[in-house]
Amino acid sequence: MTPELIFIVPYRNRAPQKKVFECVMPTILEDEKYKIIFVHQKDNRPFNRGAIKNLGFIYVRKTYPETYKNITLVLHDIDFMPYYKNQFKYKTKQNVVKHFFGYTNTLGGIVSINAGDFEKINGFPNIWSWGLEDNVLKRRCQVAGFVPDRSTFYHGGVDEDKVITLWHGWDRLINPKIKRKFTATTNLDGIKILKNVNYTIEEQSENISVMHVTNFITGESHLVGSQDTKLRNSRENKFFKDGYDGKNQNVNRRQTGLLPVMIIPKRRQRSIFKGL
């Protein structure tokens, strides 16, 4: 049976967050026809979020070749989840892109898009080591004439207490040459140029799979590890240096190690995590 919703959740080095996600979301989605695919980049290269999400789509297309164009893809960060059923109406339709959590200048965080539409715009750019892929996705959707739906939307800088938030570090590798290239342009880089893709599928349950990606080649693979790639802090300001928990500024994220910091009102913690 073809699911109506397929969640594509990219991750690497996020085992605690993945554990929370796979415990919470089945309860949230128990009334839906859904599938969750964790797409795990398993090599030693910098994380390529755009390519990893594109590979999730490629797997969906291969698995459901006759029906994939009518599936709603939910591009979902592993660090954020709804608190309760029907908080987000994930299902969308052709030419409508739903944005539930994130920032309005991008299409990142939690986004629903028709799989046929995602293919039409060639998915995300395959950008190594930086998060610009969400900005480019927004531009591609605008050019295609898709309608953004933020009728239920929580802003990442203001409304983090309205969703389950699992904090992690903010350090990323940024390649300035690639940033300049993708600020300029086209739909050429995306799903269509990925090649030499190798992966295995781990079926964790009827509704949850892990796609372990061990290799893929993009148009920019030759730039990985180049000298102009520098370690920077993508949100360098006093709050994120000193630690900030949304209210009391008493969580130092640089000391949290691999464990996620959960920003959850106490009144909701017991009901959400009683099954963990």
Label the model's feature ranges.
Residues 40-43, 78:
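Acidic ATP/Mg2+-coordinating residue in the GHKL
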Residues 2, 14, 20-33:
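Short, acidic, metal-binding catalytic loop of nucleotide-sugar glycosyltransferases
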Residues 3-9, 25, 35-38, 56:
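Hydrophobic targeting segments
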Residues 135-276:
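C-terminal catalytic/acceptor-binding lobe
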Residues 48-52, 57, 65-66, 72-200:
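Conserved catalytic core of nucleotide-sugar-dependent glycosyltransferases
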